[in-house]
């Protein structure tokens, strides 16, 4: 038997064992070594990448036996390099070919459906518990050498491992990501629905890959059920293109919702090229696309999203004025997503909301929302007094880049928000802004401490 090893396995008698039997036990050695390495390093891998490389257990059968050749190649390369570069190149060749083989092997294996499982990043307490149980297991094994106790400890370790990425959360979570001069808001419902509102930036490069996608992996998000795009400006969609490119076996997008302006002349005049490019990209990837007009909605449990704008048949002079505006409700909680809508769109929203309420025999819509996502990054032309007095937000979230050249948010906009008593949170000052909603109450937290 292997002694003082985490897994018991009978060693063959080399004198009596056949060639194929020795090969099988060599493979078993590689698998066991790979499992031991994975068991020890898995929490670290989860913290760094938020995913489990399942395929690595199988790749180690090939990788580990060849590591000795790479070591030998490296040693001889170092020695030869002191004498002759040509000789060093010769000895480095063997190791280089093996490393190239590793790279191609990993690239090929990444296309398998369950090669990698996205789990999210575990919290510190659970990682500490995992390592505590692991150390206890090793100590018990080394001291007692008892299979039954080993089995109990291993079963406990598996339970803790499962708990590293399994979350039972009764909260709805909202995150306004710090994407610089742009917009991106992610919502997670307790029922497991994941929704993205816009995703772009003109001040951060590769914001889709390195900010939005990284955040989604951190949270263990493997799919976005809905992606709502307010309008096709770069600071709202360039990260979406990157997310589309990242769709593979570990990440997918269900439905993309676009503003219902495809039937208006504004498409040709204002954003025809941008909208057409976006539609072509989505069509090529097979992602489901729907168009939202005022009055359209989706609902899942307590969570609902209703389109308040664009109004049907309206002529738009500015691309920002046809930004899709959505009222998000979760129980008694409400949040208004305004994209880059400005005064003209705001007036249309108020008039249309009152008209729909009157037709239904109801009072005015979304009076006093809990949170307003301030339109157009807090520009002077957005958040008019009429609109704010109608919406009456308790809190206002502004997404803008630090020191941006547009002067966002504008002083007059901040004064108007202050005048109605709304507490303002800004990503240029606070970084990421998180909202937790539970049983009608909510709490807003900033990633960085607010000034003052």
Residue ranges and their predicted role:
Residues 7-15, 22-24, 60, 79-452:
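Non-globular, low-confidence helical/coil segments that flank catalytic cores
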Residues 1-5:
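Conserved small/polar residues in nucleotide/adenosyl-binding loops
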Residues 53-64, 89:
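Non-cytosolic membrane-interface motifs at loop->transmembrane helix junctions
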Residues 63-66, 71, 98:
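Hydrophobic/aromatic-rich transmembrane helices and adjacent perimembrane loops
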Residues 15-36:
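Interfacial and helix-entry/exit segments of alpha-helical transmembrane bundles
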Residues 46-56, 385-387:
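Interfacial helix-loop-helix junctions of multi-pass membrane proteins
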Residues 41:
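Globin-like tetrapyrrole-binding proteins
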């Amino acid at each position: 038997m292997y002694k003082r090893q985490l897994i018991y396995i009978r060693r063959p008698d080399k004198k009596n064992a056949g060639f194929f039997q020795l090969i099988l036990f060599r493979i078993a050695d590689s698998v066991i070594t790979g499992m031991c390495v994975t068991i020890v390093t898995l929490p670290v891998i989860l913290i760094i990448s938020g995913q489990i490389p399942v395929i690595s257990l199988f790749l180690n059968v090939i990788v580990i036996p060849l590591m000795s050749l790479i070591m030998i190649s490296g040693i001889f390369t170092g020695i030869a390099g002191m004498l002759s570069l040509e000789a060093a190149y010769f000895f480095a060749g063997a190791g280089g070919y093996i490393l190239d083989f590793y790279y191609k092997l990993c690239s090929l294996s990444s296309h398998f459906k369950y090669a990698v499982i996205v789990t999210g990043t575990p919290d510190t307490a659970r990682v500490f518990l995992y390592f505590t149980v692991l150390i206890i297991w090793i100590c018990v094994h080394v001291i007692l050498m008892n299979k039954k106790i080993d089995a109990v400890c291993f079963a406990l370790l598996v339970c803790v491992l499962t708990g590293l990425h399994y979350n039972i959360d009764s909260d709805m979570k909202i995150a306004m990501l710090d994407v610089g001069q742009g917009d991106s808001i992610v919502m997670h419902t307790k029922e497991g629905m994941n929704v993205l509102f816009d995703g772009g930036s003109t001040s951060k490069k590769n914001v889709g890959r390195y900010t939005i996608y990284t955040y989604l992996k951190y949270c263990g998000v493997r799919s976005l059920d809905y992606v709502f795009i307010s309008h096709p400006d770069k600071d709202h969609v360039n990260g979406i293109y990157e997310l589309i490119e990242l769709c593979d076996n570990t990440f997918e997008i269900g439905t993309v919702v676009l503003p219902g302006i495809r039937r208006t002349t504004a498409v040709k005049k204002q954003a025809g090229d941008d909208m057409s490019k976006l539609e072509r990209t989505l069509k090529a990837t097979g992602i489901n696309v729907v168009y939202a007009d005022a009055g359209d909605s989706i609902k899942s449990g307590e969570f609902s999203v209703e389109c308040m704008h664009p109004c049907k048949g309206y002529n738009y002079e500015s691309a920002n004025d046809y930004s899709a505006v959505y009222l998000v409700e979760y129980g008694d909680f409400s949040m208004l997503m305004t994209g880059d809508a400005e005064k003209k769109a705001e007036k249309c929203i108020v008039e249309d909301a009152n008209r729909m309420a009157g037709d239904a025999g109801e009072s005015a819509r979304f009076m006093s929302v809990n949170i307003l996502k301030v339109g157009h990054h807090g520009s002077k032309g957005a958040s008019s007094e009429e609109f704010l007095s109608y919406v009456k937000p308790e809190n206002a979230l502004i997404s803008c880049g630090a020191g941006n050249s547009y002067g966002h948010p504008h002083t007059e906009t901040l004064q108007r928000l202050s005048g109605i008593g709304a507490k303002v949170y800004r990503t240029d000052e606070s970084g990421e802004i998180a909202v937790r909603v539970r049983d009608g109450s909510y709490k807003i937290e900033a990633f960085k401490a607010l000034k003052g």
